[in-house]
Amino acid sequence: FVLAQNLGADTHTFSPEFSNERGTTGMHGSGLIELLAREMTNDMLAIRAAAIAEAANTGGPVRVELLTKGVSFGAVTAQANGDVNTDEVEGVGIDLVIRPWSQKGVTISMREFTINAMNHHHGMQAVERYGMTRTGTRDFDQDLVVDELTAGDMTAIVLFQASLAPPSQVIPENPDFAAA
């Protein structure tokens, strides 16, 4: 499954926390999904920053709800010294970053998702992850093809994905079919 190439054999488990379930987000409408995730992330980071500022100003703890776009992610409590208690955070990591991609929601952007997918499913490595700057070689997988996917290639692929229209419902014109 996606990202399994990053796990060693010693990680084999039957725990549901590390399952091979499928629930991967579709690519149609993915640009909108990524924008929403970024907006929600920014909202929560701003809420946390405001709580930290208020706690510093008042000299006492400030508890705030993490509510964005009608979705609650629990709460954080900021202390006057800048520490933030995240024990009440739910449904998102304590860094408050929404990661909408991959089957477990562990990938932050379509670009990261696509770099992983191109490597895992097509055996093609993006220069920005597997190229000379990061690995010291232009042919990380030693298949005799150097610089397989440039930054421009990856940008074009991600822009294509991001611009795919969201799915829509088409109601048949035949009333019998429409009623079915």
At which residue positions do the language-model features occur?
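Periplasmic c-type cytochrome electron-transfer domains
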Residues: 1-180
